Amino acid sequence: MALQYTVTHRNNDMSDIVTASGATGYIIIYSGALPANVATADAGTILVALPCSATLGTVASGVLTFNAITTTAIATSGTAGHWRLCTSAAGTTCIAQGTVGTSGADLNLSTLTLTAAVNLSISSWTITAFGA
């Protein structure tokens, strides 16, 4: 049997992410392997840091729907390996992290090959709390 939680619990989990990101959250896409956990320093290279809205998003039914994410020019060419949600573009305080892919990943992009100076856009994104 799969572990399950109430909608209230899942909403609280997602709301904690919104609160922790503050008004300066960034989705940072890195090269390399996903770190063991959010407290582990990232050994990858920052390819692009996309600013999030001052209010990260809205939560309903255990799903965090991100508000606008600013289209940003890729800083460094490379292969996208994972993402982190951090409180600054430097990536020093990580709140959440996950996989990047073209299908079936936590964050899906049209390509994993990122080229410097090309704009990257995330038109919509959701994160669903576990335990549904």
Each PLM stretch: what is its role?
Residues M1-W83, T87-A132:
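Small cysteine-rich, disulfide-bonded extracellular modules of the LU/uPAR three-finger superfamily
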